[in-house]
């Protein structure tokens, strides 16, 4: 707004009624909804566009309640939300309510009703929020490390075209168990509670070795069932391998078992039932969502 227009606006203020003045005062003194969120976000450590150091960022006004900065090197402006899942997201006054809806595990329609937005907005917000969670998991595990895989039926939910004949609700895949209709998800957890899970393209030795090598410490003890892919990894990396068979009386061998990851499989699938099928395209986001709830429960700070 230019100076002349602003002065004209101020000249109209004496004409307001008392109710209108109270409303104007409330709007002027109430902080922007995004301000409370911005206070919890870390300061800009570098330019999100050219990765220049924070010392190269100069204050460049305000926008939607957020301080903007201009990079001295690339001359582009940014804020703490630039290039994050929350960038360009509207209705900031609803973000905390929607974050709480995620903690409560609400469906899209339930979250939409709680936040007063349409279901399409609620769906888009869900995956904006979950995108940030999908990559937050353990980077290194040691001690006794449990590993096991579970399978989800491949789903093209939400897509206009299907590469196969449609299945009716509650249908089953053309193949059983580990066939091409099923997507393997490998869960890894140590006794310290460090947790990681991976949606795999194929359940073979090459894929498992590539995933587990940077995750499992060389001095760890890997506990698994009798699947040969884990034996291949242990042999290739020199990791101690303890096989625990899924048979009565053999599921626990002293301190070695895979009960933690099997329990997580059960809780994950029971929790997923409320969504009546998850598109494989978004499966990683839902894995991150459940991982956050398992680790923090209702103690998540929104």
Predicted regions, residues:
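Residue-level recognition of single "structural anchor" positions
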Residues: 1-302
């Amino acid at each position: 707004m230019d100076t002349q227009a602003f002065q004209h606006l101020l000249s109209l203020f004496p004409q307001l009624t008392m109710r209108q003045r109270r409303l104007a005062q409330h709007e002027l003194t109430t902080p922007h909804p995004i301000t409370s969120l911005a206070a919890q976000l870390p300061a800009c450590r570098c330019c999100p566009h050219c990765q220049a150091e924070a010392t190269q960022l100069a204050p460049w006004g305000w926008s939607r309640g957020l301080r903007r900065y201009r990079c001295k090197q690339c001359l582009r402006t940014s804020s703490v939300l630039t290039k994050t899942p929350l960038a360009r997201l509207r209705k900031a006054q609803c973000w905390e309510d929607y974050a709480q809806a995620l903690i409560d595990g609400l469906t899209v329609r339930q979250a939409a009703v709680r936040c007063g937005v349409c279901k399409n907005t609620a769906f888009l917000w869900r995956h904006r929020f979950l995108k940030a969670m999908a990559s937050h998991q353990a980077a290194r595990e040691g001690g006794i490390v449990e590993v096991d895989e579970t399978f989800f039926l491949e789903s093209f939910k939400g897509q206009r075209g299907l590469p196969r004949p449609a299945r009716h609700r509650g249908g089953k895949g053309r193949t059983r168990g580990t066939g091409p209709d099923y997507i393997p998800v490998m869960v890894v957890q140590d006794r310290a509670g460090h947790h990681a899970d991976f949606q795999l393209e194929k359940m073979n030795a090459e894929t498992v070795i590539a995933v587990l090598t940077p995750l499992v410490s060389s001095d760890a003890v890997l506990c698994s069932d009798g699947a040969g892919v884990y034996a291949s990894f242990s042999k290739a990396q020199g990791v101690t391998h303890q096989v625990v068979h899924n048979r009565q009386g053999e599921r626990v061998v002293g301190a070695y078992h895979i009960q933690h990851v099997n329990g997580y499989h059960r809780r994950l699938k029971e929790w997923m039932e409320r969504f009546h099928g998850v598109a494989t395209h978004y499966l990683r986001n839902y894995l991150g969502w459940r991982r956050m709830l398992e680790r923090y429960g209702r103690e998540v700070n929104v």
